[in-house]
Amino acid sequence: MTKFVKIAAVAAALLGTAPAFAATSVTGAAPSATARIIRPLTLTATGSLNFGTIVMNNVTANRTVTVNPDGSITCAVELVCDTTGSFVTYNVTGTNGQTVNIIKNTSTLTGSNSGSLTLTPVGANSVVLTNSGAPGKDFPIGGSIDIAPTTIDGVYTGTVDVQVDYN
Amino acid sequence: MTGRRIALLSFGALLAGALGMSGPAPAQCRLCATPSTQTITSADSDNMRIEIEARLDFDQLVVRDNSPGSVQLQPDGSSTISGSVGAISGRAMVGTAMVHGEPGRFVRVDMPTAITLHGIRGGTIRLDSLVTDLQSAPRLDSEGMLQFRFGGALHIESNADGDFRGDIPITVDYL
């Protein structure tokens, strides 16, 4: 009888043991970590923006002359312009594959006989770098000016204001 | 004699059944000192999940030259730069994750100490010192949620530039 009771106690102990469940664990979708490493931009220019000679022929309203980024000149009526001018070639260096915005700001050309003209650079709005550092990427910049009936003749000079920045 | 044999056989059957049990077998506990009628299920992992609300994004880093540099982004959003790293973008963001599970449960959150970010155009950079803003004993709140942020330190070797990306696996366990 005693033996029977002991066996029962062992059986009860075995059945009564709480099952050991594995600790629950979940792993979420891996969040990504990202970084964009870029090198400082450098901008250099060669050449100059030259509209050539513009003859005012009884100008009655504001007329625009444009040196296109390929050097050709678009001449408005009442003006006589050269066929071609010269444009500025810029070179920008930075990080391969990055898009660089080209910021074109107006500037003032000062006349030799007083007077001034507003110069607006003309060209692409951005370029994509195809290498890091040298050789960089070239891009041309032309410009446009408005000739008014009151524009004073003379030689106008100034600087072209172009900046670059990563997109 | 017959009655005694039947009793022994009965217990033998019970013992065989107990020894033959494999794996967690949900069952009512009938012979416990304090019997419980509550069914123990394996649904704990079914109601816990992690949502990644924001990735760890160092955004744009400007490096001045080819010497090594590093930038550290803390879970509170503060950052420090050193070496060739000249600036970190103001749009850099720490990572944010949300754990959903049983209200009031204590959890353990595991992340690797370091990972490798791979460049789209080749190359690698190291991200280490991964750290969270969790308390020492994180616990799901009364709504079963726990949000935490994480950051780390990015190490940039010479000539590394471009876009880099890597994955940070996060594991959460109930305690």
Task: Describe the role of every protein-language-model region.
Chain A
Residues 1-9:
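Bacterial N-terminal signal peptides that target proteins for export
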